[in-house]
C-alpha cells in the first residue's frame, strides 16, 4: 500500500438500536471512497463494532459489509471476548484519520469522539461537546434557546418525576396548560423517532411518558404543530456551508419510526418548493444551530415551517446523520452540486483543518 495514501479508518455498527442503518451508511461511504478520484488519495480500513460493543478489524468488518447485516455471535471469531472495547483490533498507528459512521448512543454522543481525541487522531464530524449536546435533546434545546433560536414550546422532565405522584400531577397539569394537546413525548437521547409517541389526552400522555422513561431517564414533551417538515445539511469546520433545503412528506398522522422506515410511506422533495427567502432563512438557521451546539464537519438540521403564519421553528440537529444512498444528508448535497465521492473527500479534508 503506497505510503502517500491517507489511511482512513471507517468504523461502523455499534451497540445501538441503529446498528443496521450504520452498516448501510458505511457501505455507501466506502463505495464513495472507491471512486477513481478517491482511490488516488485514500485507503479505507474498515472496523466493525458488534452489537455487544466489541471492536473488530478489517476481516470481520468486510464480512459485515458483504452480508449487509449485523453479525451474530456465532459468526464472530471464537472465543468471544467480554462485551465492550477490550482490545484494539489493529495497530492504532495503521490509521491516520477516523471516519465514524455510527448512529445513536455510543456513536454520535461524544463517547467514540472522546476515544479518538485521546488517541490524538483527527476524525470526521463534531468533537465531544458538539456530539454530546447534539445527541441530548434537552441540552440541545437549551443551547438553541441561549442562542435565541425559535423553537416549538416544550418541557423537560425525568423518569424519576413519574415516580412521585404529587410531582407528576403538577407536571401533567403544566403540560396541559402550557403545551396542550396534541403533544409529543420523546426520549432525550434516541434517534430515528425511536420511543416517540403522540398524545391527544392525559391517558396517552401518561402512557407515552412511561414508554419513553423505559428507554431514557431524560424526557421531553413538545407542543404539536401543524407544519411542513424541512431539512438542511451543513458541511465545514471554520466556514460552514448549508445545502439546498429538502422536504419530507409522509402518508401518516406524523413522521413516526414505522413511517420513516417503511418503503412508500414517505417521500422527499429536493429542493423543497419554498419561497427563496424562506429557504435562505432556513439555511441561515441551520448554520446558527451548528454554532449554538458547537457542531462542525457534518450535520443535518431539521425545522418546522408553518406556511400560513410564516413561522419557522428549529426542531433538532443530527451531528452524525444517516449516510445511506437514500439518506437526506448526501442527497441534499448531491442536489447542491457535491456528489458522494466529493462529499466524503471534503469531510476528510474538513477533519484535518
Curated annotation (Swiss-Prot):
What name is this protein filed under? Answer: D-alanine--D-alanine ligase
Report which gene this protein is encoded by: ddl
Q: Gene3D superfamilies, alphabetically? A: 3.40.50.20, ATP-grasp fold, A domain, ATP-grasp fold, B domain
The cross-references to InterPro entries, in alphabetical order and at most eight, read: ATP-grasp, ATP_grasp_subdomain_1, D-Ala_lig_Van_CS, D_ala_D_ala, Dala_Dala_lig_C, Dala_Dala_lig_N, PreATP-grasp_dom_sf
Q: Where does ATP bind?
A: 176-231
The entry's function note states:
Cell wall formation.
Q: Enumerate the spans annotated as ATP-grasp domain.
A: 141-349
Where is this protein found? Cytoplasm
Instruction: Describe cofactor binding as the record notes it.
Output: Binds 2 magnesium or manganese ions per subunit.
What is the E.C. number? 6.3.2.4
The GO biological-process annotations, alphabetized, read as: cell wall organization; peptidoglycan biosynthetic process; regulation of cell shape
Q: List positions binding Mg(2+) 1.
A: 302, 316
Signal peptide limits = none
- HAMAP family with a match to the protein in the record: Dala_Dala_lig (MF_00047)
Provide the primary localization.
cytoplasm
- Taxonomically, the superkingdom here is Bacteria
Q: Quick one: which residues bind Mg(2+) 2?
A: 316, 318
Keywords from the named record: ATP-binding, Cell shape, Cell wall biogenesis/degradation, Cytoplasm, Ligase, Magnesium, Manganese, Metal-binding, Nucleotide-binding, Peptidoglycan synthesis
The cofactors it requires, by name, are:
Mg(2+); Mn(2+)
- Alphabetized Pfam families for the sequence: Dala_Dala_lig_C, Dala_Dala_lig_N
Stated family: Belongs to the D-alanine--D-alanine ligase family.
Amino acid at each position: 500500500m503506497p505510503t502517500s495514501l491517507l489511511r482512513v479508518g471507517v468504523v461502523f455498527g455499534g451497540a445501538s438500536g441503529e446498528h443496521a442503518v450504520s452498516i448501510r451508511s458505511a457501505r455507501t461511504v466506502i463505495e464513495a471512497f472507491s471512486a477513481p478520484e478517491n482511490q488516488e488519495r485514500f485507503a479505507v480500513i474498515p472496523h466493525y463494532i458488534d452489537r455487544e460493543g466489541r471492536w473488530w478489524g478489517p476481516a470481520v468488518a468486510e464480512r459485515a459489509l458483504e452480508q449487509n447485516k449485523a453479525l451474530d455471535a456465532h459468526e464472530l471469531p471464537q472465543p468471544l471476548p467480554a462485551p465492550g472495547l477490550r482490545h484494539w483490533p489493529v495497530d492504532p498507528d495503521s490509521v491516520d484519520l477516523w471516519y465514524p459512521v455510527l448512529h445513536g448512543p455510543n456513536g454520535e454522543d461524544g463517547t467514540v469522539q472522546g476515544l479518538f481525541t485521546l488517541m490524538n487522531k483527527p476524525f470526521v464530524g463534531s468533537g465531544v461537546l458538539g456530539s454530546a449536546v447534539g445527541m441530548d435533546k434537552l441540552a440541545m434545546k437549551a443551547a438553541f434557546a441561549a442562542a435565541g433560536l425559535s423553537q416549538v414550546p416544550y418541557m423537560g422532565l425525568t423518569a424519576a418525576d413519574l415516580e412521585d405522584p404529587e410531582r407528576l400531577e403538577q407536571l401533567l397539569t403544566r403540560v396541559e396548560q402550557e403545551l396542550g394537546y396534541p403533544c409529543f413525548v420523546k426520549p432525550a437521547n434516541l434517534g430515528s423517532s425511536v420511543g416517540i409517541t403522540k398524545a391527544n389526552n392525559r391517558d396517552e400522555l401518561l402512557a407515552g411518558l412511561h414508554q419513553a422513561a423505559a428507554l431514557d431517564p431524560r424526557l421531553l414533551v413538545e407542543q404539536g404543530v401543524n407544519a411542513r417538515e424541512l431539512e438542511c445539511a451543513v458541511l465545514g469546520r471554520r466556514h460552514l456551508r448549508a445545502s439546498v433545503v429538502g422536504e419530507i412528506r409522509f402518508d401518516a398522522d406524523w413522521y413516526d419510526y414505522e413511517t420513516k422506515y417503511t418503503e412508500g410511506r414517505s417521500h422527499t422533495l429536493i429542493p423543497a418548493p419554498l419561497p427563496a427567502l424562506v429557504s435562505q432563512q432556513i439555511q441561515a438557521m441551520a448554520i446558527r444551530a451548528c454554532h449554538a451546539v458547537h457542531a462542525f464537519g457534518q450535520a443535518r438540521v431539521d425545522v418546522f415551517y408553518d406556511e400560513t403564519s410564516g413561522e419557522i421553528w428549529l426542531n433538532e440537529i443530527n451531528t452524525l446523520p444517516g449516510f445511506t444512498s437514500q439518506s437526506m444528508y448526501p442527497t441534499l448535497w448531491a442536489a447542491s452540486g457535491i456528489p458522494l465521492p466529493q462529499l466524503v473527500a471534503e469531510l476528510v479534508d474538513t477533519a484535518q483543518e
